[in-house]
């Protein structure tokens, strides 16, 4: 995931100041731009020198051939005049004045210079790339500039009644319908581990089927993705920080051969966006085939580093969940990708409207965008039991930022175009099932249970098409209040004190009797 290097090159029409400004608006280090420009300038000089050295090497070989044809003596003289050692000014005439043995020596020296130049070029290329991959995409003009998403995310629109309050939160409701095993899940899988069971398994499958049907009717091709990716491919779709904060590493045998002792490093996917982004890696996509729209279905795995203490109960924020994703490859021309961006968020909105989930759409501030996103809109549902908006959907246009690293090009072949262009890539959540279940539970709770949303009834089994009944008490109703806890602790202390006093009196009585 990177920007076009020509954007940093003034002689190619680029504007480093614009990228520096983008970094500042993202509240990231603008000095990376200057470091990249410096490394790139030195790299280009190094490559120019290497090209000239290779030309000189070929000239040496050609001159030797001409002299051999003339049957000039080879001799053993390998001394090289000082003026010839300055390869930048070496000419064909200067070489012609040398003996064959001297030219051979010059060619060897040129070989050494080429090797040295190549080593320097590789070093500069690595330095340039280290800076390039940490510089974010150019921002869309409509992105709010701020580093505080809690205060400055811009609400674009609201749908439904986002003021209504209800009694229970999803943390209690998943227990009340007996659809969740949290403590046992944590024993088996660790923190945030869970078993989804019974009615919530049916509700999850209903959401998956309804989401896939909805996207299928809009021209999306359903696709079930791999759950893990090779390290070198994941590096092309994920930014560096994700490897530390989000992705799980999987170590396995290098091959299926029993005598193979090598090991292979893979990463579990955090979203189906990652493998779908790599689906057309190293391909040319024809204009007439675009847009290509995929409805990705996968299990997702996230470490959630940095989320310590947040949403530790229930199924809203977990390490493993199912998700249906919109993913689109679009033309880079005529504002097509931005039209698609609006279409994708609209598709998500219509899905949640059909489920009767109130929400608002927020334009995410620049400081909270990942490197790839030029703009991101979130759909945050209203949770009436929790009294809060919670994110269900993220919709991003990454323009050509991802495609450039993956080498997914637009058009026929390089020969047909003046300059290689790259497709635009967009992604949007359709339904992260556990989060959507939480939203449904809170919005559709009644005194007796959870009313099944109209659109999901046909996907639910007999007996659960109208109402998911409560079969257990709410945990919050079983927990003693702080006052009750304090009174109970006080009573325990008083009782303990009485026991000590009684024991003391009994001992005194025994002494007196004796």
UniProtKB/Swiss-Prot annotation:
The record marks 429 as: Important for serine binding. Signal peptide: none annotated. Keywords: Acetylation, Aminoacyl-tRNA synthetase, ATP-binding, Cytoplasm, DNA-binding, Ligase, Nucleotide-binding, Nucleus, Phosphoprotein, Protein biosynthesis. InterPro entries: aa-tRNA-synt_IIb, aa-tRNA-synth_II, aa-tRNA-synth_II/BPL/LPL, Ser-tRNA-ligase_type_1, Ser-tRNA-synth_1_N, SerRS_1_N_sf, SerRS_core, tRNA-bd_arm. One of its GO terms (biological process) is selenocysteine incorporation. Residues 471-514 are annotated as: Disordered. ATP binds at residues 302-304, 318-321, 391-394. The modification Phosphoserine is found at residue 241. The modification N-acetylmethionine is found at residue 1. Its EC number is 6.1.1.11. Its main location: cytoplasm. It is found in: Cytoplasm; Nucleus. L-serine binds at residues 271, 302, 325, 427. Pathway: Aminoacyl-tRNA biosynthesis; selenocysteinyl-tRNA(Sec) biosynthesis; L-seryl-tRNA(Sec) from L-serine and tRNA(Sec): step 1/1. Residues 505-514 have a biased composition (Polar residues). PROSITE patterns: AA_TRNA_LIGASE_II. Pfam families: Seryl_tRNA_N, tRNA-synt_2b. Residues 479-502 have a biased composition (Basic and acidic residues). A motif (Nuclear localization signal) lies at residues 482-494. Consists of two distinct domains, a catalytic core and a N-terminal extension that is involved in tRNA binding. Catalyzes the attachment of serine to tRNA(Ser) in a two-step reaction: serine is first activated by ATP to form Ser-AMP and then transferred to the acceptor end of tRNA(Ser). Is probably also able to aminoacylate tRNA(Sec) with serine, to form the misacylated tRNA L-seryl-tRNA(Sec), which will be further converted into selenocysteinyl-tRNA(Sec). In the nucleus, binds to the VEGFA core promoter and prevents MYC binding and transcriptional activation by MYC. Recruits SIRT2 to the VEGFA promoter, promoting deacetylation of histone H4 at 'Lys-16' (H4K16). This is Serine--tRNA ligase, cytoplasmic. The gene is SARS1.
């Amino acid at each position: 995931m990177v920007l076009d290097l020509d954007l940093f090159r003034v002689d190619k029409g680029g504007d480093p100041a614009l990228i520096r400004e983008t970094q500042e608006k993202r509240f990231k280090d603008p000095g990376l731009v200057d470091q990249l420009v410096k490394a790139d300038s030195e790299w280009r000089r190094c490559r120019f020198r290497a090209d000239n050295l290779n030309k000189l090497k070929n000239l040496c070989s050609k001159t030797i051939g001409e002299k051999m044809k003339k049957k000039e003596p080879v001799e053993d003289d390998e001394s090289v005049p000082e003026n010839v050692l300055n390869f930048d000014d070496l000419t064909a005439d200067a070489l012609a004045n040398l003996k064959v043995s001297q030219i051979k020596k010059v060619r060897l020296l040129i070989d050494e210079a080429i090797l040295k130049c190549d080593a320097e070029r590789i070093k500069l290329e690595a330095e340039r790339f280290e800076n390039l991959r940490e510089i974010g995409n150019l921002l869309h003009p409509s992105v709010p500039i701020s580093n505080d998403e809690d205060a400055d995310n811009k609400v674009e629109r609201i749908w439904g009644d986002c003021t209504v309050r209800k009694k229970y939160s999803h943390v209690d409701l998943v227990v009340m319908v007996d659809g969740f095993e949290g403590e046992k899940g944590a024993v088996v899988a660790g923190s945030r581990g869970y078993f989804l069971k019974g009615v919530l398994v049916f509700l999850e499958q209903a959401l998956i089927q309804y989401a896939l049907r909805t996207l299928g009717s809009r021209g999306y091709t359903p696709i079930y993705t791999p759950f893990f990716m090779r390290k070198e491919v994941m590096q092309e779709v994920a930014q560096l920080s994700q490897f530390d904060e989000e992705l799980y590493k999987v170590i396995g045998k290098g091959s299926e051969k029993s005598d193979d002792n090598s090991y292979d490093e893979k990463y579990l996917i955090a979203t189906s966006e990652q493998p779908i982004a790599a689906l057309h890696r190293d391909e040319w996509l024809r204009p007439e085939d675009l847009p290509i729209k995929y409805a990705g279905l996968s299990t997702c795995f996230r470490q959630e580093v940095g989320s310590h203490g947040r949403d530790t109960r229930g199924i809203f924020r977990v390490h493993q969940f199912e998700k249906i994703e919109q993913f689109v490859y679009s033309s880079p021309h005529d504002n097509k990708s931005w039209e698609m961006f609006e279409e994708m968020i609209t598709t998500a909105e219509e899905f949640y409207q059909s489920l009767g989930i109130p929400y608002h759409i927020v334009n995410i501030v620049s400081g909270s965008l990942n490197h790839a996103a030029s703009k991101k809109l979130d759909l945050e549902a209203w949770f009436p039991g929790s009294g809060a908006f919670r994110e269900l959907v993220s919709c991003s246009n990454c323009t050509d930022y991802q495609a450039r690293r993956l080498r997914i090009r637009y058009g026929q072949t390089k020969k047909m175009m003046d300059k290689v262009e790259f497709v635009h890539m967009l992604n949007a959540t359709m339904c992260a099932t556990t989060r959507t279940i939480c939203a449904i539970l809170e919005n559709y709770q009644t005194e007796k249970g959870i009313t099944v949303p109209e659109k999901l009834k046909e996907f639910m089994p007999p007996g659960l098409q109208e109402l998911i009944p409560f079969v257990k008490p709410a945990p919050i109703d079983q927990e003693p209040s702080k006052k009750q806890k304090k009174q109970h602790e006080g009573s325990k202390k008083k009782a303990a004190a009485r026991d000590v006093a009684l024991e003391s009196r009994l001992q005194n009585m025994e002494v007196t009797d004796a």
